Amino acid sequence: MTTKKKQKLTGGHAVIIIVLVLLAIICFYPMWYTLIMSFSDKVYVDAGRTWLIPLGLNVKSYGKILKDSLFFSAMWVSVKRVIVGCAVSMFMLIITAYPLCVPEKKFPASKYIKWFFLANMMFSGGLIPFYSLMRQYNLFNNFWVLILPGALPLWNMILMMNFFRNVPYALNESATIDGANPIQILFKIYVPLSVPSIACLFLFQFVGHWNGYLDGLLYINDPAKQPLQTYIYNLSVTLDYSTMRSEDIIAMAQTSDKTLNAAKVIVAMLPILCVYPFIQKYFTTGMNLGAVKE
């Protein structure tokens, strides 16, 4: 029978634990502060007295959200953006990374394509030309302006390419000898063997689309077509009472713009908090597959 020796806590370990605990508190407290603010009474929030626990428990901010049709309209735009954007981006990532992962002697042009992508990552045409381009393509005030410009994120494409390189190329050659075409090889060999990596990049795309606000702010003027994060940004930066209905102004007097915005941030965070636990088990595995070389 073997017994494990207890390791003594050294000074170095204690320092590491303290630093990690402090980092955990720094990361967790902003979310906790937003949560308690959303449930606190406006008197305590405006006085700056809410720090650790909710004061004067109040759920009127969440009741106001349930009556805000524009909030749910913006959320529906974000949901559509996540579904369509992730589907388009993952498809583009897979079909672009696959031919670039093969050895250069099999596909000599891949070297030049990689340099072309790298140049696009390093140099940008600028915001104003890009804005004009969106207008010329009639994408201004169009849902697809949230999808098409970022349909192929180049950094994620490089990660996907490295993930595919971990699949032995001998499998590709064996499948070719057996009569499989490139599409069959991709979707029956590479994709199933790269599920953790694909799930990892899917999480990146999901968070990116859900948290995106700048494109909606720049290219969409119609509030009914803007995504949720743009809607919340507009509320947090500018609160225009001239465009609000009388019942909204009365509700704002009973709550607070701070508590209302905090409640909307909490509601907007829920989809990420719900999706992440299911993909977390793939996250570390997927990143290791692209980072470790033997």
Which residues fall in each region the model found?
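A hydrophobic, multi-pass inner-membrane permease signature
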Residues: T2-E294
